[in-house]
Amino acid sequence: MKTLVYKEIKEKLGRDFILENPKNKNLAHFATPLAFSLAKELKQNPMIIANDIVVKLKDCDCFESVEALNGYVNFKLSKAFLNSLATQALSDSENFAKDDKKEQSFLLEYVSANPTGPLHIGHARGAIFGDTLTRVARHLGYKFDTEYYVNDAGNQIYLLGLSILLAVKEHCLKEQVQYPDEYYKGEYIIDVAKEAFAEFEKDFFVEENIPQLALWAKDKMLKIIKQNLADAKIFIDAYVSETSYYSELENTLKALKEHGGTYEQDGKIWLASSVKGDEKDRVIIKDDGKGTYLAADIVYHKDKMSRGYDKCINIWGADHHGYIARMKAAMEFLGHDSQNLEIILAQMVSLLKNGEPYKMSKRAGNFILMGDVLEELGSDVLRYIFISKKCDTHLEFDVDEFKKEDSSNPVYYINYAHARIHQVFAKAGKSVDDVMYAKFESLNEDGMNLLFESLNLKAVLNDAFESRSLQKIPDYLKNLASLFHKFYNENKVVGSDNEDEFLKLFAICALSIKIAFALMGIEAKNKMNHD
């Protein structure tokens, strides 16, 4: 809708301009401050320029009114224009709020948790944000691929193998074992150990077989992780292995050296990242000749940045904040534009249950598992919660608040609007097809506001994607549901003279809720549990 209005105005004025969304929709649906930017150029009073703009635009069919106010030009859309948009949306509902295919392409790498155990609630936040970003981007016409970087090398994988071996010895072979200071613990380790004991012969469980056991356990853990993600309706396009990049390490080091990106000191190879704004230089090859985690990660990012995507996006935990400068420095040394590597940080999550800290999982020791919270709340509610606040802000929520069946629970409140609309159609004995060509002739201001917001979904999605502020989608839905409930409570629908008109209004509202929820990975309810 906003795009159509912009094109209409640009055609008449012959220039680009800013089109704003005023908060008071009773005053205007859109406004432009163009007169202020032209005032310097034309050396005229912006009030006079605004009046000239009004004269040029007042005959546009899409506007009910075009008015100048304090230098701004305000536009109110006509019922006929909004009606045509609503009819088009309902007749082609599959494509509502979609955008034309865009040339810009993205590669999103997210989750990428070590394959040493199930996902915890911190992983879940980045996972749900990343999946929602993907859904919205694809809906808006972007090429948007997704990837999970599997850290299947290094000490943590050896520790996994050792932890499984010790658990087999203790719980299956009934031996006395001495656990090291660092190892993986929890019921999930014991469960996998029992699977390993059933898979291999008894004499397999010796120290020299730890590497083989570790690789076997890593695959088991990845299956658990993929199941955690699937339970939250998250499916990642590709899983790429850290070890698969080792053969490229030498070439990458050579390229870094050629561009002045590394130097040797104290028997180590250092990335000269401080030259590019990092707080200090970083070791990438240790004095034993082995690469650090950063070294492997540089190789992986070099590959990603060389695949032809316009932008590579990473979602990292907030504890990786200090990692951004060194990775961008490495990419710059390798000849890539670091502006094309975007890092989104997922902040910490604090869970409460009835006002008290949520209990840690017995299965994982000192973590709250994603699977446990999914089991308690369900995927739809958890997804809503994690999208409801900007990803880089701390999130605290009480699971019991989202079990309430009243307006204090936004998931319930929005679903109730959608279900109510289905009930009204059932009560009227009509379908969307029956009312698709009804005309909006008698809508009051509340009805017009509901209609405008229902048709404004695409603009909300574009704004949410471009600003990476996905919380704008649930904010939009809460407002839309509020507008609907207000109109529903104050107007008779079934049996009124305006029945078809109101039903058409409700149909476009329900369509917006359904699509916005689907892009959040949530299924809109047609019927509430108590109905």
Swiss-Prot record:
UniProt enzyme class: ligase
InterPro entries according to UniProt: aa-tRNA-synth_I_CS, Arg-tRNA-ligase, Arg-tRNA-synth_N, Arg-tRNA-synth_N_sf, ArgRS_core, DALR_anticod-bd, Rossmann-like_a/b/a_fold, tRNAsynth_Ia_anticodon-bd
GO molecular function, one term: arginine-tRNA ligase activity
Paired cysteines (S-S): none
UniProt catalytic activity: tRNA(Arg) + L-arginine + ATP = L-arginyl-tRNA(Arg) + AMP + diphosphate
The UniProt record lists the keyword Transmembrane helix: no
UniProt keyword list: Aminoacyl-tRNA synthetase, ATP-binding, Cytoplasm, Ligase, Nucleotide-binding, Protein biosynthesis
EC assignment: 6.1.1.19
UniProt KW Translocase keyword: no
One GO-annotated biological process of the protein: arginyl-tRNA aminoacylation
Pfam families to which the protein is assigned, alphabetical: Arg_tRNA_synt_N, DALR_1, tRNA-synt_1d
Subunit structure of this chain's protein: Monomer.
Family: Belongs to the class-I aminoacyl-tRNA synthetase family.
HAMAP family tied to this protein: Arg_tRNA_synth (MF_00123)
Identification of the protein by name: Arginine--tRNA ligase
